Every structure is written in C-alpha cells, then in structure tokens.
C-alpha cells in the first residue's frame, strides 16, 4: 500500500528522480522538526558562510606550493586566484551533524552542490500532501532572484553590449544533473538554452574557418558564442582534466583560460572551487588554534562552536586518543571516506575509492544522529545529515539526507516539515 501511494504521489511531480539507479531515493514520509532547530541551523550557516567567504581572499594570497599542499590539483593552480564576481559562490551547501545540544559543520560544498530541486521545490509539494508547514516555503523565490542576478552580474563583467547568450550545461547522460540544471534554467526565467557539455565547442584563439573570422570563445551547437555558461553540476576538478576524445586537446584548461580572458563567464565562478577543498577547514582550524588575529574574537567563538578539529595529518587524534574521519580534500557522496576509532584502527569505510589520489584531511569523528522513517518496504532507523544551502553566502533551504554513518550516493532524501 505504501509503495503504491508513494508511486502515485511522486509520479505527478514532473522531471523528478524519486528513484535513482533503480532504487528508492525520495521517501514518502516527512520528518518534522521544530522551527527552533531550523532557525539554529540557519544562524550557524550564516555565520559559517561569512567565515568561509572571509577566508577566500586569504587563500588567493597564498603561493602555489601552499595551495598545492591544501589539496588543489596542480593543473588548477593558474586559475585559483580568478575573481570574476562579487560573491565567492552563488549556490553552495553546508552539511551538518545536528544533535539536541550542538550543531557541527561536516563540510562545505561550494562548487557544485546538488540536492537543490528536492529542497527548493519538491519539499513544498510533500509538505502540502502531508499537511505540514514547509520550512523552505519562501526559498524558491530567493533562489530565482539569486540565479537571475548572478547571470546578469557575470555578463556585465564581460563588458559586452550584445543580448547575452546564456547556456545551461551538464552531462545529459546523468538524469539528476540534467534535470537539476533544467530546473535552475526554468527558475532563472531568462532567455537561455540547455546544451549538453558534449556539444559545447571551444575555440581557444581567434581563427579563420572557410574564410570566416571566428573569435576565441565557447560556442553552442548552432555556432553562437556563449556569454554566460552555467555549470551547476560539473565539478571544476573534473573539468580541468577534460580532454577532447579525438584531438586530446585539454578542453578544460582552454575553458578556464577563456574565463580568465573574459571571453566567457562561468557560474558557479572559479572562486567557488577555491572554497571546495576540505583542507580549507584545516586551515581555518589551524588559524583558530593559533588564536590568529586574522579572525576576530567573535569569529574564533563561531569556529569553536561549529567547526570540528580538522588537520592535514592524523597525529593529533592518535595523541589525544580520539576517533577521526579520513576524507579526500576533493570528493563527493562519501566516496573514499574512512572512519577510525580512538586507537587509529579503521572501523568503517566507503567501498568506492575514486578520490584516493587527493590530499587527505582528518576530522574529529562525530556520530550522526538517527531517526525513524518509512521506506517502501519497512520502517527503518537511519542516520540523518542536515544540509543548508547558502545563496551568495546567506542561509537558505534546509533538508535531510538519511542513510549510513557515511552519507553516500545511496542515501535517501527525507522530506522535512515543521512541528
């Protein structure tokens, strides 16, 4: 019965992936939370967002060797100091462990956060269906404004006078990425087209083809030069490695060079990638432990309250006999994450090892709280992790992913309502 109700409800939602990889993803259930907890998460998110954005100019002032030691791939170093917009990141997401007495930051996804359509759009429909209030009720309008503003700000930085050619792009073979990108394009409500990444054409320098002069730039499938390229779901660390399959040209490098030359504007901007490395948290924690004057007394208090001790080595935890998590400085969906007990013995790990080549960071382990919820087949108890989006650094929609202690790509989307 539950399965049929779920199917009937979710199949009415257009362009939504309630099942992923052939398994249940969106739960037909709602977790109710007090407005006090939601407000506390948002307050934490606002303060943490400010701290990260304050740290970005400091990162841009570091030399290449230091940035390399913070896990940034060597190929990205020439582009890390690019500042193309006022904001460091248009859409980012903070992940939290939330218990009754504390809120602790696990990580920031500043570059390509997903979970957008679920929280800004689907959550409202679920709340209406279950007749509870939606904590994210006003957030979709804010997202629409943030998108529109970002597109025109990015375009204005190019100093052009033509009507902007705005393109939203993703891998069209990945359902979640494509549908998220199409949702954002519709919400932005600007004259834009969707072009799969595979159909973009990059012209690294001005050339002549069949007697026609072609400017350096990124072109859509109709041969029109793109002004603003929105790449919400395509991580920069993947982009930088991209090669043309036939010519083996480094198209990722070319694209970022064109952004550097103001031939195209990219959103999220390259500055978002600068905050993506989890080693940035280790840097913030190191400055905090040194009582460094870079942060004010109030900011040190915020770090003490919400951040977990994070280092580029495991020794502090071994010495203090504390459990810790080892995770790659760049990584998604719990991939390559390992948990160690206070004796330094591995007790849990994600089976995927995609990001092993990246610098590791070590963070104090904090158990995720659990909650009960209904799946298609049974009522289960699962670990829950809260996400809170930042729009231009300001707290926005809140939501829950449920699953294992290591939140991976098999976790559920658990809708959230107000008590």
Regions found by a protein language model. Give the residues of each.
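Preference for protein termini
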Residues: 1-419
């Amino acid at each position: 019965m539950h399965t049929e109700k779920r199917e009937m409800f979710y199949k009415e939602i257009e362009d939504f992936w309630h099942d992923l990889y052939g398994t249940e993803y969106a739960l037909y259930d709602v977790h109710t939370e007090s407005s006090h907890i939601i407000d506390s998460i948002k307050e934490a998110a606002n303060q943490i967002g400010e701290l990260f954005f304050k740290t970005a100019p400091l990162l841009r002032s570091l030399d290449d060797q230091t940035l390399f030691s913070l896990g940034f791939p060597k190929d990205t170093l020439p582009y890390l100091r690019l500042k193309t917009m006022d904001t460091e990141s248009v859409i980012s997401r903070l992940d939290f462990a939330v218990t009754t007495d504390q809120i602790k930051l696990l990580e920031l996804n500043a570059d390509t956060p997903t979970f957008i359509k679920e929280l800004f759009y689907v959550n409202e429909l679920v709340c209406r269906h279950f007749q509870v209030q939606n904590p994210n009720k006003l957030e979709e309008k804010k997202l629409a404004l943030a998108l529109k503003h970002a597109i025109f700000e990015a375009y204005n930085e190019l100093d052009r006078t033509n009507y902007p050619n705005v393109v939203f792009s993703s891998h069209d073979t990945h359902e979640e990425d494509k549908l998220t990108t199409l949702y954002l394009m519709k919400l932005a409500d600007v004259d834009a087209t969707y072009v799969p990444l595979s159909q973009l054409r990059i012209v690294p320098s001005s050339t002549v083809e069949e007697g026609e002069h072609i400017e350096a730039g990124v072109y859509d499938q109709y041969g029109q030069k793109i002004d603003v390229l929105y790449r919400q779901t395509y991580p920069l660390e993947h982009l930088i490695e991209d090669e043309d399959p036939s010519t083996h040209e480094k198209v990722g490098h070319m694209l970022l060079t064109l952004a550097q030359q103001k031939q195209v504007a990219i959103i999220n901007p390259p500055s978002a990638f600068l905050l993506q490395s989890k080693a940035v948290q280790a840097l913030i924690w190191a400055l905090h432990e040194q009582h460094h004057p870079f942060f004010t007394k109030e900011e040190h208090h915020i770090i003490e309250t919400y951040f977990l001790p994070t280092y580029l080595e495991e020794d502090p935890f071994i010495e203090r006999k504390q459990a810790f998590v080892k995770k790659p400085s760049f990584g998604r969906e719990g991939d390559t994450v390992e948990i160690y007990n206070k004796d330094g013995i591995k007790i849990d790990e994600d089976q995927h090892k995609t990001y092993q080549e990246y610098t590791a960071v070590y963070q104090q382990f904090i158990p995720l709280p659990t909650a009960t919820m209904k799946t298609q087949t049974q009522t289960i108890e699962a670990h829950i992790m809260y996400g809170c989006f930042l729009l231009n650094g300001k707290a926005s929609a809140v939501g829950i992913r449920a699953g294992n202690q290591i939140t991976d790509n098999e976790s559920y989307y658990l809708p959230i309502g107000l008590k």
